[in-house]
Amino acid sequence: MGLAELRELIEPEETDLRALAGREIAIDAFNALYQFLTTIMKDGRPLMDSRGRITSHLNGLLYRTVNLVEEGIKPVYVFDGEPPDLKRETLERRRERKEEAMEKLRRAKTKEEREKYARQVARLDESLVEDAKRLLDLMGIPWVQAPSEGEAQCAYMARCGDVWATGSQDYDSLLFGSPRLVRNITIVGKRKHPHTGEIIEVKPEIMRLEDVLDQLGLESREQLVDLAILLGTDYNPDGVPGIGPKRALQLIRKYGSLDELKDTDIWPKIERHLPVEPEKLRRLFLEPEVTDDYELDWDEPDEEGLVEFLVEERDFSEDRVRRAVERLKEALQELRKGGRQETLDAFF
């Protein structure tokens, strides 16, 4: 929702993982784990161990993280905390959609139908989150617990210069002020399109906040947030019905802000569809709850701990796990030996 509707007006920069070498990337953990749950499947169902516990998230997190480090990227995963109260409606809608999809999954007769609805019912519960944190600890990969929205924490770390960019599929990172957003960082490669079934090549994309503002003809992040509010955000999911992307952009360009629209004929319609005053919605993006309580250290992986967790407890192949650990050790050594590989992007 929101900025995603402006996709046709925004031109991201297509790149590859090698171009991100030497960069610290704060990855939206919930976003990445949900991708793993919905794409790493067998016969339309997530991977499971012999006790029926889901392992797709562990599979994706292990091998994708190793791949990123091998490309010279320093990932740090950021986990969501308590969502703001205004997000409850969005979360309730998601819950209802999952219940509807669950009923369709029960009636599914083909593999394609099972895969489709299995993706829609995937849930990231507390046990899966704790699994992921335990795995990252054993891998020596840092993670951060956000007090509220994970993307807000990622953006804060990027603004502070502790990481170079946010890694997420969602455009909200830009609303939270991340100077750079890297999309598709955890799903690079050939993938089956979730709706058409077509095999497509997925490549990383970089979106710079300054470039997005320039392409949209906006002067500030505050204007970008007001634009998103008109289109709909997680805190006002319906936006303002009847005001599409182009009309919303025209209004913000012409009047400068939602506040300046209060004396126009269109304001009663806008006000009717906002759950609270615009300033309260703005503050969720411009002044989100974040923390400085984090340390970014990439440590030596605990090979035997990983074997105990993944092989003995979760039925992974010992040979594959040990090979992954060896790859991770070698990649981390290369990072320490080579240091930060500056690119021209560092100067912009």
From Swiss-Prot:
Its cofactor is Mg(2+). InterPro entries: 5-3_exonuclease_C_sf, Flap_endonuc, Flap_endonuc_arc, HhH2, PIN-like_dom_sf, XPG-I_dom, XPG/Rad2, XPG_CS. Keywords: DNA damage, DNA repair, DNA replication, Endonuclease, Exonuclease, Hydrolase, Magnesium, Metal-binding, Nuclease. Mg(2+) 2 binds at residues 170, 172, 234. One of its GO terms (biological process) is DNA repair. SUPFAM superfamilies: 5' to 3' exonuclease, C-terminal subdomain, PIN domain-like. Residues 340-348 are annotated as: Interaction with PCNA. Residues 113-256 are annotated as: I-domain. Residues 1-98 are annotated as: N-domain. Pfam families: XPG_I, XPG_N. Disulfide bonds: none annotated. PROSITE patterns: XPG_1 (PS00841). GO terms for molecular function: 5'-3' exonuclease activity; 5'-flap endonuclease activity; DNA binding; magnesium ion binding. Mg(2+) 1 binds at residues 28, 80, 149, 151. Its EC number is 3.1.-.-. Binds 2 magnesium ions per subunit. They probably participate in the reaction catalyzed by the enzyme. May bind an additional third magnesium ion after substrate binding. Structure-specific nuclease with 5'-flap endonuclease and 5'-3' exonuclease activities involved in DNA replication and repair. During DNA replication, cleaves the 5'-overhanging flap structure that is generated by displacement synthesis when DNA polymerase encounters the 5'-end of a downstream Okazaki fragment. Binds the unpaired 3'-DNA end and kinks the DNA to facilitate 5' cleavage specificity. Cleaves one nucleotide into the double-stranded DNA from the junction in flap DNA, leaving a nick for ligation. Also involved in the base excision repair (BER) pathway. Belongs to the XPG/RAD2 endonuclease family. FEN1 subfamily. PANTHER family: FLAP ENDONUCLEASE 1, FLAP ENDONUCLEASE FAMILY MEMBER. Interacts with PCNA. PCNA stimulates the nuclease activity without altering cleavage specificity. This is Flap endonuclease 1.
